C-alpha cells in the first residue's frame, strides 16, 4: 500500500503544500507574497494574514494536481519551526485540524531539515541523484548559515554556524543599503555577473574553527560606499556592478573557506548545498569548481527546491514517518528549534 504524505510549509512568507507518494513528488504548490517588497523585508503580521488566506486554496490545488482526495492521505507533515511564529501557527493549526478531521497522524518537521533533505525528493521521468551518507550540507538562507554533517536522514551534526548574521541577511541588508531593493540576493547575483569581482575588496572576518560571521562584511561595505559617495554622489550608480561582484565574491569566499576546511577535517567527499542562497549562481559555480578540484561528489538542488517549499517538508516528514515517529496534537510552533 502506498504512502501519501501531504507537506505544509508556512515558516516565513511562502505558503506551500505538496504531496509525495512513496518519496516521489506528485505536486508542489507555492503562493508567494509580493506585499513585503514595499517594506524592504518580511512584515510578520502581513505574512501571517496572507497565510490564512492562502492555506486552504494552496492545499486544495496540491491535492488536485496530485490527483488524489484528502481521504487518500496517509499522514500530514508540517513545519514546526524555525520561522515566524504567526506564520508557523497557521500551518501548524491547519495540519492539526486536517489530521483530526481525517483521523491520520501529523508529523512535525524542522524547516532546516527540509532544506538539508531536498535532494531526496524524487521526480518521475528525471534522474534522481542524491548524496550518500554521510555528507556535508552547506545550509545558507536568510535566517541561517550552517555546515551540517548529515550521518543519516534523521541524524545531524552541526560543525559550524554563524555567530551573528546569516549570509542571506547580509545580501538583503546590503542590497537595501545600496538602494537595490528586496530581496537582495537575486539582484546582487544578477549585477555581479556584469562586474569585476577583483576591483573592490571587502574585509573578511578571522573567526576560528568552522563558525561564520558576516556582520563585519556588511560594515566594511557600509563604510566603503559611504566614503566613496561623499566624494562622488554618483559613485554607486557608476560602479554598482563591480561593487556587487566584489561583495558577492567575498561572501562566497567566506562560505567556501570553511566548507573546504570541514571537508578536510571530516574526510567526507559528498557535498551539497541547501536554502535560499543555494540558488546563487556564483556559489553554485564555485562549489562545482571546488568539487572538481578536490574530488568531491557535489549535488545542487533544483532551483524550485532552493526556496521555501513543501516538497522538502513532505520528504522530511516521510523519513520521520518511516521511522515510526508521530506528533501529538498538543504541539505548538516555535521560532527556534533544534534538529531532532
Predicted regions and their residues:
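N-terminal beta-alpha supersecondary unit
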Residues: 3-82, 111, 243
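Short beta-strand scaffold segments in enzyme catalytic cores
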Residues: 15-20, 137-139, 145-149
Amino acid at each position: 500500500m502506498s504512502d501519501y504524505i501531504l507537506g505544509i510549509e508556512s515558516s516565513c512568507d511562502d505558503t506551500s503544500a505538496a504531496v509525495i507518494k512513496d518519496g516521489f513528488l506528485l505536486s508542489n504548490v507555492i503562493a508567494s507574497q509580493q506585499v513585503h517588497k514595499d517594506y524592504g523585508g518580511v512584515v510578520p503580521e502581513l505574512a501571517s494574514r496572507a497565510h490564512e488566506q492562502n492555506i486552504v486554496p494552496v492545499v486544495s490545488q496540491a491535492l488536485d494536481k496530485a490527483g488524489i482526495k484528502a481521504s487518500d492521505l496517509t499522514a500530514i507533515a508540517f513545519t514546526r519551526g524555525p520561522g515566524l511564529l504567526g506564520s508557523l501557527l497557521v500551518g501548524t493549526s491547519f495540519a492539526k485540524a486536517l489530521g483530526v478531521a481525517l483521523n491520520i497522524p501529523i508529523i512535525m518537521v524542522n524547516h532546516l531539515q527540509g532544506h538539508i533533505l531536498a535532494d531526496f525528493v524524487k521526480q518521475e521521468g528525471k534522474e534522481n541523484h542524491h548524496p550518500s551518507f554521510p555528507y556535508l550540507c552547506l545550509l545558507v538562507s536568510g535566517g541561517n548559515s550552517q555546515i551540517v554533517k548529515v550521518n543519516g536522514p534523521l541524524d545531524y551534526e552541526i560543525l559550524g554556524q554563524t555567530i551573528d548574521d546569516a549570509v542571506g541577511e547580509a545580501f538583503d541588508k546590503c542590497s537595501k543599503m545600496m538602494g537595490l531593493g528586496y530581496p537582495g540576493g537575486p539582484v546582487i547575483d544578477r549585477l555581479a555577473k556584469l562586474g569585476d569581482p577583483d576591483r573592490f575588496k571587502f574585509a573578511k572576518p578571522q573567526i576560528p574553527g568552522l563558525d561564520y560571521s558576516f556582520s563585519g562584511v556588511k560594515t566594511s561595505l557600509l563604510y566603503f560606499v559611504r566614503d566613496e559617495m561623499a566624494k562622488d554622489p554618483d559613485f554607486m550608480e557608476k560602479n554598482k556592478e563591480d561593487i556587487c561582484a566584489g561583495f558577492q565574491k567575498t561572501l562566497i569566499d567566506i562560505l567556501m573557506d570553511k566548507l573546504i576546511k570541514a571537508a578536510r577535517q571530516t574526510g567526507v567527499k559528498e557535498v551539497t548545498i541547501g536554502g535560499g542562497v543555494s540558488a546563487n549562481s556564483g556559489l553554485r559555480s564555485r562549489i562545482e569548481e571546488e568539487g572538481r578540484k578536490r574530488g568531491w561528489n557535489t549535488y545542487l538542488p533544483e532551483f524550485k527546491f532552493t526556496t521555501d517549499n513543501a516538497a522538502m517538508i513532505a520528504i522530511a516528514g516521510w523519513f520521520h514517518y518511516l521511522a515510526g515517529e508521530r506528533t501529538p496534537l498538543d504541539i505548538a510552533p516555535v521560532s527556534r528549534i533544534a534538529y531532532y
